[in-house]
Amino acid sequence: MDSKTDNKRLCVIIPTYNNVRTIRQVVMDVRQYCSQVIVVDDGSTDGTSAELSSLSELITIVTCQPNGGKGHALVAGFRKAREMGFTHAITIDADGQHFADDIPAFLGQLDSHADAIIVGARNLTEENMPRGNTFANRFSNFWFRLQTGIDLQDTQSGYRLYPLGALRGLGLITSRYEAELELLVFAAWAGTPIFSVPVKVYYPPADERVSHFRPVYDFVRISILNTVLCVLALVYGYLRMAARAVRRIFA
C-alpha cells in the first residue's frame, strides 16, 4: 500500500478548538497519508481560524459558532463527510498528540473490517502522560465493559476510524468530549463491531500542553453520563444485544 491514500471512500476529520500552535503541522502531517481532510473549527478564538484560512486550498473547513464541544464538532464533521460522499472517516486530534504515520494501521483494516469502528489504543505509560488522563481512561474502560460486554483498551482515544453508515440514527446525550464514549456505547448496542489497533501518542511537558480537560467538572460529567448509560443498558442495551445473540443461535 502506498504511504498516501487517495481512497475516495475515506477522509480524515480534525476537530479543533484553539490549537493555533499545532493545527498547521497536524494538517500537513495528515496530508502525507490522506489527501481528503475536513477540519471542524469549533468556535476558536486564538488565531486558529486564520491559520485554517491559509490552508483552505488543501482542506475542507467547517465552522461552528459558538463553541459547542468536541461531540458537536464531530457530528458536524461526519455530516460534511457524508455530504461529500465518503463512507468512512478517521478522526484525529488537533493538539499533536497523535501521529499521522499511524493512519496506515487503520487503512490496513478497512477492507477486511469495513463495518467496524477501529479505535487507536494509546500506551498509557508514555512519558508526560497526565496521571488524571490515565485514571479517567481506566474508569471509562470499566464502565464501557459493564455497559456493552466489550473489553476495549482505550475508550477515550480520539484517534478512530468510523464507518459513517453505522453512525446514522445514533442520538447523543452530550455534546462535549465525552460524546466519543457515547458513540462507542450506542454503536455497540446497535451491533457495530469495535476493536483496537495500537497507536503512538505524544504528550508535551505540562508547561507546553494545551488541554480543555477540567478534572473535577469533567469527571462529574462523565460519572453522570455513565449512570445514564447504565440505566439505558438495563432497559435497552442488554435486551438488544441479547436479541442479536438469540438470532445468531437460530440463524
Task: Show where each model-derived region lies.
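Hydrophobic helical membrane-anchoring modules
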Residues: 1-7, 149, 172-251
